Amino acid sequence: MHGIAGVEFSSYIMLNNKKIKLHILGYGFDENNIKMLNLLQEMKEKRVAAHIKLLNFAKMKLLNLPEESLSRINMERYCWFDREFIKCLEQDNYSMDVINYYRDYFKNNRFSYGPDYDLEVQRVIDAIHSADGFVVLAHPMAYKLTRDEVTNIISKLSDLGIDGIEVYQSDC
């Protein structure tokens, strides 16, 4: 057994003048491909910018968070989650009312997962293919779309060149 390169991109596709967020998986690609490396770097920079926006929003608008709380979050990490922000609140002994408010806020608004860093799906497909990778639509039934919308998206993605579709997601 051996490992292969893998990545999940946050991307979007237009469907009936509506921007639909999708996750695209790339497998078995050349990890040294320049086009792929550039797209990964762009996604990282967009994610970091979105996370800074989240922290500034929370710091200025919602709570008087001390700088040392925010400094515990590693903004350069490639993958950063809302739970790290909530962990800072817990470490600073904020009440459960405040912590639960933020859990609900992030869950309902997805502030840190907004369109600030979604990439156009064709760019993602092209980058993975240019690196000799395999392109897969992740969890198609998890997008809270109608069956017809999912069918239309799969058809459109097929025309754009995806290679496969994830068929099982444990929480769907």
Predicted regions and their residues:
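An N-terminally biased module of ancient metal coordination in phosphate/nucleic-acid-related enzymes
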Residues: M1-K21, F106-F111, L119-C172
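A metal-dependent hydrolase metal-coordination microenvironment
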Residues: M1-W80, L160, I165-C172
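Generic detector of short, locally flexible boundary/turn motifs and exposed helical patches
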Residues: H51, R77-F81, I99-R103, S130-G133, ...
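Non-catalytic, well-ordered alpha-helical scaffold segments
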Residues: I52, R83-K87, Q122
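Short glycine-/small-residue-rich flexible loop motifs, especially phosphate/cofactor-binding loops
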Residues: L55-N56, I86, I125, I154
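Residue-level signal for well-ordered alpha-helical scaffold segments within enzymatic catalytic domains
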Residues: F57-M60, C88, A127-S130
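Hydrophobic, aromatic-enriched interface-forming segments
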Residues: M60-Y117
